[in-house]
Curated annotation (Swiss-Prot):
The active site is at residues 177, 463. This is Malate synthase. The keyword Chaperone does not apply. Disruption phenotype: No visible phenotype under normal growth conditions, but the frequency of mutant seedlings to establish into plantlets with true leaves is decreased under short day conditions. Gene3D superfamilies: Malate synthase, domain 3, Malate synthase, domain III. Pathway: Carbohydrate metabolism; glyoxylate cycle; (S)-malate from isocitrate: step 2/2. The gene is MLS. GO terms for molecular function: malate synthase activity. The lineage of its organism: Eukaryota, Viridiplantae, Streptophyta, Embryophyta, Tracheophyta. Belongs to the malate synthase family.
Amino acid sequence: MELETSVYRPNVAVYDSPDGVEVRGRYDQIFAKILTREALSFVAELQREFRGHVKYAMECRREARRRYNSGAVPGFDPSTKFIRDGDWSCASVPPAVADRRVEITGPVERKMIINALNSGAKVFMADFEDALSPSWENLMRGHVNLKDAVDGSITFHDKSRNRVYKLNDQTAKLFVRPRGWHLPEAHILIDGEPATGCLVDFGLYFFHNYAKFRQTQGSGFGPFFYLPKMEHSREAKIWNSVFERAEKMAGIERGSIRATVLIETLPAVFQMNEILYELRDHSVGLNCGRWDYIFSYVKTFQAHPDRLLPDRVLVGMGQHFMRSYSDLLIRTCHKRGVHAMGGMAAQIPIRDDPKANEMALDLVRKDKLREVRAGHDGTWAAHPGLIPICMEAFTGHMGKSPNQIKSVKREDAAAITEEDLLQIPRGVRTLEGLRLNTRVGIQYLAAWLTGSGSVPLYNLMEDAATAEISRVQNWQWIRYGVELDGDGLGVRVSKELFGRVVEEEMERIEKEVGKDKFKNGMYKEACKMFTKQCTAPELDDFLTLAVYNHIVAHYPINVSRL
Ligand SMILES: CC(=O)SCCNC(=O)CCNC(=O)[C@H](O)C(C)(C)COP(=O)(O)OP(=O)(O)OC[C@H]1O[C@@H](n2cnc3c(N)ncnc32)[C@H](O)[C@@H]1OP(=O)(O)O
Ligand SMILES: O=CC(=O)O
Ligand SMILES: [Mg+2]
């Protein structure tokens, strides 16, 4: 089916919502097929059952933050040592997803979904998180797209190129990543309060797709999910209960739903066993979400001026704290019988410069070889053009084995300590680092405000996680007036210096994107927001949460009911 959303006609119809549920987003007949009374009732049930738990978990995050801000550092929890030391395993891996050597990721856009499913990757992670700007239109179209993808009818007609896209006979297995616990969905009010974004994402997707998915993709299992940005196992416990609730509603076996948790916050690295334990009936492993992890390192240590990061480009997987995290993740997953997934190299193909392209591909190749040799069972690709390289690295090492869960134990990683996981990254800080953060942060935010959650910038993939690093690093450097020691000039970062950098980088952006795009895009608004966040006395928790209201579009309702 081709997706054609209706032309907006104000106030002609409203969604058929159950009691206590108010949909404030634009009405569209196509969206109404997703926002059915039954599906909304399911979302409302989830919201009512779990909102107290979610609020408590968010309060615990704030409490932990207060402790870190008073000088504490995260570490292993003595009270859950029995879980770390215990002899237990997760449920066995469903055959449909035993082989996950290359997974492609991307936002839930129609053409991207078709391209990703056809890409030759084993898995496609359809993203409502880092790669999506969660506007009402993006979210609802995303659900329509996923439903069409799961039932196999999805097509897309690119009119400018007169090209029709449809699914191949063989496609990647679909995983869906709902938003993190922290993000509200302001277009759906439940009992007068914005719904929890991830419960909307999960609830709508699950409700409409579980039956078909299990039949066609999961060989009796599924649906499959990726779970982002958790900080503690109590958050995994909520997800486990959500899954059990959904399985009960659907009348399917407990343990049908499976999820891979991204370890992408610093506190969560100390909770990997505990997270797997909570989800042991529903787990298919952990993934190294390296970009959010770096962001989280800065956020966790926002009040620790002795733990400043060097230039963003220097914080890679070669840093001791990053390597330790990846090694410990592999050991933990394999001990518990599940996949240890690698992460995303940020390089993407460079079409107009063969030499630069070869260098970019070589960086990806090296990153993937490092991952597979370390024992990872699979990895992420940001772009279809990277899949052959990722495949080659993983297949070259693993051969026909679907994964390395049983063959690579990494017992040596048992010796990794809290100090290893927290070791301060090494490297210099430069004015160019400050400039690049500023240029990337502003352009990313401008894209996000106008509906794109992942964009190519300076030949790299940028999304919410990578842009967060730019924001918090600028904040940290300004807050502590750090010396730019890589320039040899002894310059310290100040609000004044940052102000000049912003002005100059805005001029550069205008030159690079052209006057028209600069005028019609939201660069000036993005600049204001980004500057405010970088110079705020208190660090905002999330870039996207702080500016979310700018993409909320409430439509008046109740004029007539169809
Ligand atoms: C830190 C993290 O969370 S990582 C996970 C979240 N981030 C992501 O998922 C980012 C995914 N990647 C992307 O969004 C894109 O690759 C971008 C934005 C970086 C670059 O996209 P583009 O500028 O469209 O790339 P480009 O023009 O080279 O695309 C060429 C073709 O590949 C397709 N393509 C590019 N990336 C993807 C993808 N990830 N999935 C499916 N198709 C893709 C394009 O749709 C285009 O298709 P077409 O030839 O049929 O028109
Ligand atoms: O979600 C992935 C990350 O690196 O962040
Ligand atoms: Mg992430």
